[in-house]
């Protein structure tokens, strides 16, 4: 009966939770479809605003957790990219199409996680927009050089916000669209809250910020629009030239395009001859130069004389230079392993080849195969990838004396390619493209990207495709003339040669980095506000009833120290508030207790450490061991020494035995049969020392980098109450000597990465000079430690803090070894990157679960927060 009553009581809550989750799932799917609708062939620019508004609604919902934000963002991205990229699957099947869509969807997933973390900050629509721009930047560089296809800005070629791209490039346009969408959501949520309270009083003040943001975006677009609108008319002093585009077409679409090479070349020659005939008949204008598409001559004209003769005949017939697309062998490569460049080369009538541009951003899986040892086993199409290598240069060729920028095919989607051409002096942009392996949808989307570039850089853009769509685009983004898809045709049009540099051309990368930096900064601020970074806590003086043998601030009977009211900030929910991050600051069940700087003097009643064991792992340290042993026994005569030797081939183990014989009872040696890493050596030493009732166990390197003369600082800190005393290079008073700058940068980067990932306020978490109380080591599951290298130090520190023990950093002087060779390797770095990330995620998820179980610490969202301090007991 009791079970039945409990189930009946839970049913309404369960139904509500399921209904709420299903609603968010459906809204995420609809949002992904709407974002797709903003791109060609739909061209519903407004759908992007609605899509991001709906996604913002999902991510600001109080029931959406950080993991939920990741999931909803991933679902949104998957629906969007699966809908946007089906043209990939038409020729290679669903596998590569879905794999690419899934990879791209990871980035909106990252945005979803970011958004849930920062949503409680004042002005969250701004941070959402900044975060969206940052994830688009990340997708433009990762993986394998990035894939910017699908950036929100590229769906705005027909929209009223397009002028923003001239101010700050694609990044600013995407940010503006996201800001409008998120601002509308914020306004709607505040109006809803105001309405639910009966509409009493004035309009909600929280709508002012998002409304102002929307107005600012629209105002910026309106200010720039007149200049964009009249860009095609020129200033009156700009020269004009006539440009012709030849679209020769291919016999059939598909991946066997290369088998049609001669037919494709002949098609472009014949279409150029038709253009020449029309010029001579007065039906077309005489062009100053002609643009052929990418791969219009996939027969190298320098190797095949017949191909060169055909191109020369076309150039002489039209009486103008032709920019042809071809491939060229990389000199010096063996015949069985050739490489090529994807080249656009100027072919002058009478004199032949002249200036050239080698494609600088080659396409993975199409023009080259990354990680062939893996992908050859995953797809039968992998071996059809080319062997192209990237070129270099300014991205500018001179045709008939005109500097023309070349962005070959998919280079147009990367900000850096057209910008490099313009900064290199290009007065006109051209996009030679080969879309014979895809379909009309892909060509329409690429054409939209070219329109955005025309406005961004205030240049005419000439698009030439083997199968279409070819077009001439004005600087206002409008099409002057275009061809249909999959038909032979030519275009001729007058264009103006422009030299003005737009703000986006000049400062676009700077704005991009500002947005990325702002996103990184705001997420750190949000993580701190959400309680992810513990604050340094100082020990409290012991009361007269405290156990005299317990460290300060801690009773052996009561466990970890209680925290005062000022230690944590708890955010109280507003009445009627919709949002909750699930990240309110709370008291974790295990607590760390940390201090930094000079060690405190021993508290009254604390007995100094009596039995201290210094563990020194060795491998090929024969030159260093006698020196460090002598310095240690002179500096701290009372400590015992354990040398753990990993079968050093240089005789270090035998030398250690001699030192032990000369110092009986104080120096000991452990011989291990194999070199299993630094971590395994220390674990063996810990087990040896714990079994012999040592009260303090110290880690020390044999190479002299850890000064034995400074060991007393660590022991004083332990006697003062620390469970783990770390000899720190990076707290006040700590220094590093004779270290190569690369190692110093690596060390500081590793510490910063670990500190941020784990949320631990320890400055030198990778330090290897440290002293442990035996109680701390006994509480740690040492059998579960499998880390090696310096990751071992991070692992033990993380376990010590997670178990609620006191960690203290004391300053030391670290000196680089003078003798022997460092054991640092790339595998140590890879291990740390992976494991620290995993520990950080696991720790934050456990904190998140704890916070969600505590509704009294939930935090409100869009309209700001009221902060109060309170102590929470478990």
Swiss-Prot record:
The keyword Protein transport does not apply. It is an enzyme of class 2 (transferase). Residues 594-874 are annotated as: Polyprenol monophosphomannose synthase. Its main location: membrane. Pfam families: CN_hydrolase, Glycos_transf_2, LNT_N. It is found in: Cell membrane. Residues 533-609, 852-874 are annotated as: Disordered. The chain crosses the membrane at residues 23-42, 72-89, 94-115, 177-194, 206-223, 509-526. Pathway: Protein modification; lipoprotein biosynthesis (N-acyl transfer). InterPro entries: Apolipo_AcylTrfase, C-N_Hydrolase, C-N_Hydrolase_sf, DPM1-like, Glyco_trans_2-like, LNT_N, Nucleotide-diphossugar_trans. Residues 1-593 are annotated as: Apolipoprotein N-acyltransferase. Residues 241-497 form the CN hydrolase domain. In the N-terminal section; belongs to the CN hydrolase family. Apolipoprotein N-acyltransferase subfamily. In the C-terminal section; belongs to the glycosyltransferase 2 family. Catalyzes the phospholipid dependent N-acylation of the N-terminal cysteine of apolipoprotein, the last step in lipoprotein maturation. Transfers mannose from GDP-mannose to lipid acceptors (works best on C20-C95 lipid monophosphate substrates in which the lipid can be modified, tested with the C-terminal domain expressed in M.smegmatis) to form polyprenol monophosphomannose (PPM). PMM is an alkai-stable sugar donor which adds mannose-phosphate residues to triacylated-phosphatidyl-myo-inositol mannosides (PIM2), eventually leading to generation of the cell wall glycolipid lipoglycan modulins lipoarabinomannan (LAM) and lipomannan (LM). In a number of other Mycobacteria, including M.avis, M.leprae and M.smegmatis, these domains are encoded by 2 separate adjacent genes. This is Bifunctional apolipoprotein N-acyltransferase/polyprenol monophosphomannose synthase. It comes from Mycobacterium tuberculosis (strain ATCC 25618 / H37Rv).
């Amino acid at each position: 009966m009791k079970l039945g009553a409990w189930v009946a009581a839970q049913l309404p809550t369960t139904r509500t939770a399921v209904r709420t989750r299903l609603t968010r799932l459906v809204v995420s799917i609809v949002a992904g479809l709407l974002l797709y609708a903003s791109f060609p062939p739909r061209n519903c620019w407004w759908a992007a605003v609605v899509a991001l508004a709906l996604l913002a609604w999902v991510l600001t919902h109080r029931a959406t957790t950080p993991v939920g934000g990741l999931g909803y963002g991933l679902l949104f991205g998957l629906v969007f990219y699966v809908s946007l990229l089906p043209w990939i699957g038409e020729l290679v099947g669903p596998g590569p199409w879905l794999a690419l869509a899934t990879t791209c969807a990871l980035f909106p997933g990252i945005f979803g996680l970011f958004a849930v973390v920062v949503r409680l900050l004042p002005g969250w629509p701004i941070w959402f927009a900044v975060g969206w721009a940052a994830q688009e930047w990340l997708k433009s560089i990762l993986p394998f050089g990035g894939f910017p296809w699908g950036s929100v800005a590229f769906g705005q070629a027909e929209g009223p916000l397009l002028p923003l791209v001239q101010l700050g490039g694609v990044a600013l346009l995407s940010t503006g669209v996201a800001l409008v969408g998120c601002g509308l959501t914020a306004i709607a949520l505040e109006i809803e809250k105001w309405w639910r309270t009966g509409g009493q009083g004035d309009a909600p003040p929280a709508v002012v910020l998002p409304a102002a943001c929307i107005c600012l975006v629209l105002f910026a677009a309106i200010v720039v629009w007149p200049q964009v609108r009249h860009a095609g008319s020129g200033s009156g002093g700009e020269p004009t030239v006539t440009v012709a585009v030849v679209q020769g077409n291919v016999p059939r679409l598909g991946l066997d395009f290369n088998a049609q090479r001669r037919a494709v070349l002949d098609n472009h020659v014949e279409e150029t001859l038709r253009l020449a005939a029309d010029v001579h008949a007065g039906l077309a204008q005489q062009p100053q130069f002609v643009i052929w598409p990418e791969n219009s001559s996939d027969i190298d004209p320098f190797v095949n004389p017949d191909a060169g003769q055909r191109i020369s005949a076309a150039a002489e017939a039209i009486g103008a230079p032709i920019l042809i697309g071809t491939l060229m062998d990389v000199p010096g490569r063996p015949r069985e392993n050739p490489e090529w460049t994807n080249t656009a080369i100027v072919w002058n009538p009478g004199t032949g080849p002249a200036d050239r541009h080698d494609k600088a951003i080659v396409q993975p899986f199409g023009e080259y195969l990354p990680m062939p040892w893996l992908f050859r086993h995953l797809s039968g199409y992998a071996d059809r990838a080319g062997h192209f290598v990237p070129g270099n240069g300014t991205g500018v060729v001179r045709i008939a004396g005109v500097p023309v920028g070349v962005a070959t095919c998919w280079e147009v989607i990367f900000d850096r390619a057209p910008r490099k051409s313009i900064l290199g002096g290009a007065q006109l942009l051209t996009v030679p493209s080969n879309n014979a392996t895809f379909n009309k949808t892909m060509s329409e989307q690429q054409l939209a990207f070219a329109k955005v570039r025309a406005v961004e850089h205030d240049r005419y853009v000439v698009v030439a495709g083997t199968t279409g769509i070819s077009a001439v685009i004005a600087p206002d983004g409008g099409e002057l003339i275009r061809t249909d898809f999959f038909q032979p045709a030519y275009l001729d049009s007058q264009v103006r040669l422009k030299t003005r540099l737009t703000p986006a051309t000049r400062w676009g990368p700077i704005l991009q980095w500002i947005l990325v930096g702002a996103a990184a900064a705001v997420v750190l601020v949000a993580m701190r506000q959400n309680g992810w970074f513990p604050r340094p806590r100082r020990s409290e003086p012991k009361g007269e009833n405290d156990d005299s043998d317990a460290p300060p601030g801690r009773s052996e009977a009561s466990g970890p120290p209680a925290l005062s009211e000022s230690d944590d900030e708890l955010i109280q929910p507003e009445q009627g508030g919709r949002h909750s991050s699930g990240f309110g600051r709370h008291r974790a069940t295990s607590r760390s207790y940390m201090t930094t700087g000079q060690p405190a003097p021993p508290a009254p009643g604390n007995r100094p450490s009596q039995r201290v064991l210094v563990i020194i792992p060795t491998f090929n340290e024969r030159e260093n061991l006698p020196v460090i042993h002598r310095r240690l026994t002179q500096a701290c005569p009372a400590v015992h020494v354990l040398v753990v030797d990993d079968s050093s081939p240089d005789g270090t183990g035998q030398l250690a035995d001699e030192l032990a014989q000369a110092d009986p009872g104080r120096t000991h040696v452990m011989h291990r049969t194999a070199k299993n890493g630094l971590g395994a050596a220390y674990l063996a030493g810990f087990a040896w020392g714990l079994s012999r009732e040592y009260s303090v166990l110290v880690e020390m390197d044999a190479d002299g980098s850890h000064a034995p003369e400074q060991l007393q600082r660590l022991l004083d800190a332990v006697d003062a109450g620390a469970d783990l005393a770390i000899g720190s290079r990076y707290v006040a008073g700590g220094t590093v000597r004779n270290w190569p700058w690369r190692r110093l940068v690596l060390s500081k980067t590793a510490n910063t990465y670990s500190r941020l990932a784990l949320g631990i306020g320890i400055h030198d978490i990778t330090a290897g000079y440290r002293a442990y109380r035996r109680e701390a080591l006994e509480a740690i599951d040492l059998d579960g430690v499998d880390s090696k290298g310096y990751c071992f130090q991070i692992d033990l520190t993380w376990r010590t803090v997670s178990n609620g023990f006191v960690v203290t950093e004391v300053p030391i002087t670290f000196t680089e070894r003078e003798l022997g060779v460092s054991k640092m390797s790339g595998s140590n770095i890879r291990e740390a990157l992976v494991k620290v990330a995993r520990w950080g995620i696991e720790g934050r998820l456990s904190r998140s679960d704890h916070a969600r179980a505590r509704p009294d610490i939930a935090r409100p969202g869009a309209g700001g927060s009221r902060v109060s301090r309170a102590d929470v007991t478990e």
